[in-house]
Amino acid sequence: MGRARDAILDALENLSGDELKKFKMKLLTVQLREGYGRIPRGALLQMDAIDLTDKLVSYYLESYGLELTMTVLRDMGLQELAEQLQTTKEESGAVAAAASVPAQSTARTGHFVDQHRQALIARVTEVDGVLDALHGSVLTEGQYQAVRAETTSQDKMRKLFSFVPSWNLTCKDSLLQALKEIHPYLVMDLEQS
């Protein structure tokens, strides 16, 4: 479904410099679906159209990224560009997928966190940042301290994964979101594998 990515890029490249800046500002305030986090402001404001397209797709997947781009363009009064994206969405059959991608992919193949457990244990290096993002909302103080007490990144990730069986989908989504913020290229690489 690379068509959605291409359509987002085409739309963003058609914006003037001021319009792209306005798009990014609106993206910071637009209502997001439950389970999706915001692209950090500092990173967002520095992005050009290509980087922003990649970030939209990596954060929100192609179908929801396309839908979100349409919403922001409509809010800006750029109906024609939004309609072009709508046409692409309908042609690619993304209408049904946009509403159910997270649920379908979870039901069919298991959650990203479960699928890529070994790779995450081996490749996540900034574990403390991930822990900080999960502390309080997913991890109790005791769990947080138990993971931090481990000496290597791999041991910390193993300890973190020892708590995963008791987590619900929201907890796993929170871990995925933290990983996307701290290790975006690792997550992108694993999503494509």
Swiss-Prot record:
Keywords: Apoptosis, Cytoplasm, Endoplasmic reticulum, Immunity, Inflammasome, Inflammatory response, Innate immunity, Isopeptide bond, Mitochondrion, Nucleus, Phosphoprotein, Tumor suppressor, Ubl conjugation. InterPro entries: CARD, CARD8/ASC/NALP1_CARD, DAPIN, DEATH-like_dom_sf, NLRP_Inflammasome. The modification Phosphoserine is found at S193. The keyword Mitochondrion applies. It is found in: Cytoplasm; Inflammasome; Endoplasmic reticulum; Mitochondrion. There is a cross-link at K55, K172 (Glycyl lysine isopeptide (Lys-Gly) (interchain with G-Cter in ubiquitin)). SUPFAM superfamilies: DEATH domain. Residues 105-193 form the CARD domain. SMART domains: PYRIN. Phosphorylated. Residues 1-91 form the Pyrin domain. Gene3D superfamilies: Death Domain, Fas. Expressed in small intestine, colon, thymus, spleen, brain, heart, skeletal muscle, kidney, lung and liver. Disruption phenotype: Increased resistance to endotoxic shock and severe defects in caspase-1 activation and interleukin-1 beta and interleukin-18 production in macrophages in response to several pro-inflammatory molecules. Mutants are resitant to vaccinia virus (VACV) but not vesicular somatitis virus (VSV) infection. They show lower viral loads in the lungs compared to wild type mice, they produce higher levels of type I IFN, IL6 and RSAD2/Viperin after VCAV INFECTION. GO terms for cellular component: AIM2 inflammasome complex; canonical inflammasome complex; cytoplasm; cytosol; endoplasmic reticulum; extracellular region; Golgi membrane; IkappaB kinase complex. The keyword Nucleus applies. One of its GO terms (biological process) is negative regulation of canonical NF-kappaB signal transduction. GO terms for molecular function: BMP receptor binding; identical protein binding; interleukin-6 receptor binding; myosin I binding; peptidase activator activity involved in apoptotic process; protease binding; protein dimerization activity; protein homodimerization activity. Self-associates; enforced oligomerization induces apoptosis, NF-kappa-B regulation and interleukin-1 beta secretion. Homooligomers can form disk-like particles of approximately 12 nm diameter and approximately 1 nm height. Component of several inflammasomes containing one pattern recognition receptor/sensor, such as NLRP2, NLRP3, NLRP6, NLRC4, AIM2, MEFV or NOD2, and probably NLRC4 or NLRP12. Major component of the ASC pyroptosome, a 1-2 um supramolecular assembly (one per macrophage cell) which consists of oligomerized PYCARD dimers and CASP1. Functions as a key mediator in apoptosis and inflammation. Promotes caspase-mediated apoptosis involving predominantly caspase-8 and also caspase-9 in a probable cell type-specific manner. Involved in activation of the mitochondrial apoptotic pathway, promotes caspase-8-dependent proteolytic maturation of BID independently of FADD in certain cell types and also mediates mitochondrial translocation of BAX and activates BAX-dependent apoptosis coupled to activation of caspase-9, -2 and -3. The CARD domain mediates interaction with CASP1 and NLRC4. This is Apoptosis-associated speck-like protein containing a CARD. It comes from Mus musculus. The gene is Pycard.
